[in-house]
Structures are given as structure tokens and as C-alpha cells.
Curated annotation (Swiss-Prot):
Similarity annotation: Belongs to the polyribonucleotide nucleotidyltransferase family.
Residue ranges of domain KH in the record: 560-619
Gene Ontology BP term (one): RNA processing
Catalytic activity: RNA(n+1) + phosphate = RNA(n) + a ribonucleoside 5'-diphosphate
Cofactor(s) the protein requires to work: Mg(2+)
InterPro entries xref list: ExoRNase_PH_dom1 (IPR001247), ExoRNase_PH_dom2 (IPR015847), ExoRNase_PH_dom2_sf (IPR036345), KH_dom (IPR004087), KH_dom_type_1 (IPR004088), KH_dom_type_1_sf (IPR036612), NA-bd_OB-fold (IPR012340), PNPase (IPR012162)
Chain sites annotated for binding Mg(2+): 493, 499
Start and end residues of each S1 motif domain: 629-697
UniProt-recorded name of the protein: Polyribonucleotide nucleotidyltransferase
Keywords linked to the UniProt accession: Cytoplasm, Magnesium, Metal-binding, Nucleotidyltransferase, RNA-binding, Transferase
Gene that specifies this protein: pnp
Amino acid sequence: MSLFNKVVKEFKWGQHTVRMETGEIARQASGAVLVDVEDTVVLATVVGAKTAKPGQDFFPLTVDYIEKTYSAGKIPGGFFRREGRPSEGETLISRLIDRPLRPLFPEGFYNEVQVVIHVMSINPEVPADIPALIGASAALAVSGLPFNGPVGAARVAYINNEYVLNPTRSQIKGSRLDLVVAGTERAVLMVESEADQLPEDVMLGAVVFGHEQMQTAIDAIHELVREGGKAEWEWQAAPKNEALISRVNEIAYNELLSAYQTRDKQARSTKLKEVYAATQAKLEEEAAAAGTVAADKASVGNVLFDIEAKIVRSQILNGEPRIDGRDTRTVRPIEIRTGVLPRTHGSALFTRGETQALVVATLGTKGDEQIIDALEGEYRDRFMLHYNMPPFATGETGRVGSPKRREIGHGRLAKRALAACLPSAEEFGYSIRVVSEITESNGSSSMASVCGGCLALMDAGVPMKAHVAGIAMGLILEGNKFAVLTDILGDEDHLGDMDFKVAGTADGVTALQMDIKIQGITKEIMQVALAQAKEGRMHILGKMTSAVSGVNTELSAYAPRMITIKINPEKIRDVIGKGGSVIRALTEETGTTIDISDDGVVTIASTSSEGMAEAKKRIENITAEVEVGQVYEGTVLKLLDFGAIVNLLPGKDGLLHISEIANERIKDINDYLKEGQQVKVKVIQTDEKGRVRLSAKALLNEAAQTEPTPQQ
């Protein structure tokens, strides 16, 4: 009898065969599934705590996606030769998996749940993110935890005007769209994408196509659960304290309603804190008088939050003004200023209502490109975008340090939005870093980073293909009534049912991110949201174009200038020198940065035009070929009995034979030449071994022939 109750399911999905198995590996986890997609293998495990911690008032879900270097047949770098902190790619995929899973746990479930996905084997052509998401969903489904799944996922490309399901990496490179969609049988929950200025109907079509195709994976997970799933947990949400809800409503409803008539965020936050504190104090006073125990702060806070949500949502659905007084379609007032920081290469201050981003663009050389050591192989990235949001942006105190998952995710979204409109490396050879410093935040700071990033790049002289703007949309849905909100506030994000971010140009969408908290979102609602987002985006683009009509034609005085020359690839070693001695001396003496590609393209960068010109001249001398018939001003390096060794160019010497020095016979060469002497010589012969023969006599004879003869 086998130790294992192994269950295997296989299905064809697009161009790939997918194999899912459970029951053999990691049997002590609550759920574990191994997913194999054409040799890309991931192990997804789930462990759920049987009870919640006392006083727990939120759902502690953690998702960790971990890439093992052995999966690609590699040994990790570094002193310890083992995997360390998560890479940016691992963090982004962890977020990608977390986002569709989190809304499917029932309200009131506060038991700790940990999802860990290990990449065990990697096929460079098959990305591991979709197998990881499918595996995490399957592991949750077989675990028996209270989970309203399973979740399916699919990647969609758009190649030759057709949608392609789960494309290979090679296909993605030739696609105008890279979109990941996740959802249940009935609804889309999450979309993450970047596109090459595609129209809204193509984007929506990709979402619908992906949702239809993921049903195959969902059906396979159902089959896996039927044969290998564990018993469902006997869990029920704690009954609601109706007496507490009723009393809190009596005490706080009108006060909360009044607070939400305050348009200013800071003033509103102050009033809300006062209502929370007063409500808690009133309940404690009543409990003391009755000789009972007062409800804890967390329970009271949850009830108050529900009342806030009810007030805000009902006001919007009833056609009343939003929290800050706007209607559903109005974008907040926008202010734009460029050239904000004097010594940076490009900068912009983008303010939309109470959200503000100070964005800075920096230009660098090829040596400044980010080198990414991915499982699929090392590659270089010439465009970096980093998003920072310090605590002061929301008027709070907090930890300042390395970026958190949210900051990494927001930076990647803004990067995707701008990437489609950047010039190619051939058109603009600089590496580019954009940093978005969020100085104020009240919703949609990632989209402010897109707008500010585009303006900062233009200020830096980067020839963008078009202006790029981004906008965040929200949704309130109750039964058959819904309202799509343009340019949402932070509170509307927390209290709403959808966070929907769209970035693009006047011609189309470049990035789309959607997170949906409920399962009633239809294609029609998404269509309305996309159309309303386009209207808002066009408004912002109009403001941006009015402020900055085009790219700054001159680079900042503090940005490096670049020139490019082509040399024979066989001469690269001469420019570099033994142990890098030649190129090191070149860069130090001329104050330049020099990059040499394998095909012989040399890029020289410096803030000094004189330094660049000197470096260019010296490289041309180093790589120049000695040509027969050419005349050179050489330096005598060494005297021999039969002639002299003369240096013509760096690394290029020739022999000046004693018979080629003068027309008369020479007895002692020292009478004519000295070491270190400058001498003009002509190349009269070279051979296949690179040996060069020189003549000074030939120049003397040529000079004599050109002298005018005396008139008779």
C-alpha cells in the first residue's frame, strides 16, 4: 500500500499541457498542489490556523512567491551562496497572487492564513506567475478552508489583431498587450496589464477572453477537489452584536453624517477621530453605569466603519455630491509646474486636489542600466521608475526605510504606463531613472506618478512619443444600482467596490489595473468604467498639453552628453587594454564614461564636450589601421644597428630601416636619430603579420620633386 493518496489532473490549456497533483508532497500543510506547465513547476502550499488570535480584528493573509535558483540550474551569487531577500519580481508576483485571493475569504474570518509558492523548475519560455496563481488557488480549494473560490487566471497577448492565450516569452516580446486576468466562474476579480496604446474595446475584449479561457483551469481544480480535497472546515462567522450596532448607530450616525459634509480631508479626518473617541467614551460610560463590560475598540471601530460606508455609498447612489463635493464624473483641480529642481535633469510637480507628486527624471549611460539576474537569464533594463510615499504625505508618522510591497507595486504600474511611449535605445541612447516622491496623498497617487513622470521626462529632454496620463476610477454597486466614480479619493477607495486604474495617451491605453472586491461586476459595468476613464484621461491630457506642449529641446546643463562611434570589434581589446588599463586611463584623464558593446559600438558620455572630443580622438587613434602610403608623425622608441623602431599610433609600431632614413649611406644611426625624437615617416609596406616598414627618405625625395626648378 502506498504512503500517498496522490491525485493527478491534466488538461490542455492554450498551447500548453497543465498537470496538477496533490497528496504526495507537503502533506502536513493544510493544502498543497504541484503544478507543471511544460517543465515550469511550482509547489503551492497553504496553512491556515485553526483559531483566530484573541482580539484579532482583521484578516492576516500573507502570500509569498519564492524563486529557487536551482529551478534554472544555477547557484545563487553572494558570499553565502543561498537565496536572500525577495527580488522586485518576486514581490510583484506575490501581490499579483494576493489580490484575487483576498476578497474571496468570508467576512469575519480572522484566522491566519499563509500561502507559499516555490518555483521548483523553470522553462525560460513559460513564465511562472500564472502556474503560481493557479497553484495557490488549487491549494486553497483542496485545503477545506472557508474560501469562495476557486480562482482561475490567464495571460492574454494581442498579436496580429488576435488574442493569444498564455503566450510564451518569445510571443510576449512581439505582442502589443501583456494582460493577466484572474477571477472566479462568475466574475473577474483582478486585471494587470501593459499595452501599446490599444483602444478600450480591445482591452475589454482581452479581459473577457481571458475570463472565458480560465474556466478550463477552474473546472480542473473542481475535479482535483472532488478526488483529493480535504473536508471543509466547520467555521461560522461570529454572530453580529445587533445591540451594539443599534446603539452605535444611535450615538454616532448623525455625527458621522455631519463629518462627511466636511470637504477638506484633514478637517474631516479630525472630526471622524473625534466621533470615534466620543462613541467609545459614551459606551464605556454606559457600561460602567450598568456594571457591564464595554465593547472593545476594534468591535466599535468596525461598526463605525460600516456606518461610514453606508453613508458615503448611499449618498453617491442617490445622486448627492461626493465626499469632496464633486459629481461622479469631475476630475479634481490640477496644477502643473516643471523645472522645479535646478540641478536635476528634469522635474515636475503634479498636483491633483489633495494628491501631489514631485517627480524627477535622471539620465545616465549604458553603465547605469539595471542588471537583473532573473531565473530566465540575466538582462539589462534601461528604464527604472521608483515610487516613494513617506508617512508625511498623509499627515502621519511612521517608518521610513526600504520600499514596501505597495510602493514597489505602484512604481511598476507607473513604469508600465510610461514604457510604451519611451523612445527606443537607438533613438535615445540614455538610461533613464524616474523617481516619484509622493508629497501629498488622497487617492490615486500612482496615477499622479504617471502624469508627473511623463512631464519630468519631457522636461529632461526625453523625446516621448506622446503625453501619458493616468486616472483612478471607483465603483459603488448595490443591487441593480451602480455609480462609477472618476478620480477617486482615498476614502472612496476604502469604502467602494472597485479600484480601477487606467493610463494612456490620446490614442489608447498603455496600462490597466483592476482590483474588484465583489463578484457582481459585469462586462457592461466595466465598459461604462472604461468609457468614463477615457473621458477623465482626455481631460487630464488637455491640462498637461496646455502646461507642457512638447519635449524640452535642450538637455539640462547637468545631464551627460553622448556621442557614439563604431570600431572594429577586433579592436575592442586594444581600447580596453590589459586588465582594463587603457580604458581606465582614458576615462580618468578625459573625465568621461565609456561603454563598449560587443558589436563595436562605443558610447562616450560626459558633461564636458572637450573631454568627449579628446576621448573620441584617442579611441580613433587606438583603433586606427596603419595604411600604406599614409604619412605619420612618429616617435622613435628604440635605435637598432640596422634601423629604428618608430611608434605611429597607440600600439602601432613600424621599422624605419637604416637604408630608408636618408639618401646618403649612413655609418652610424646615432648621427641621424635619437630615442624620443619626433620623425615624419611614410608607410611603404605592411604584411599579413601586421609588420610595418617605414621610410623617411621617400618623403625627402617627394619634397625634392615638388620644388620649383630655377628659370633659365
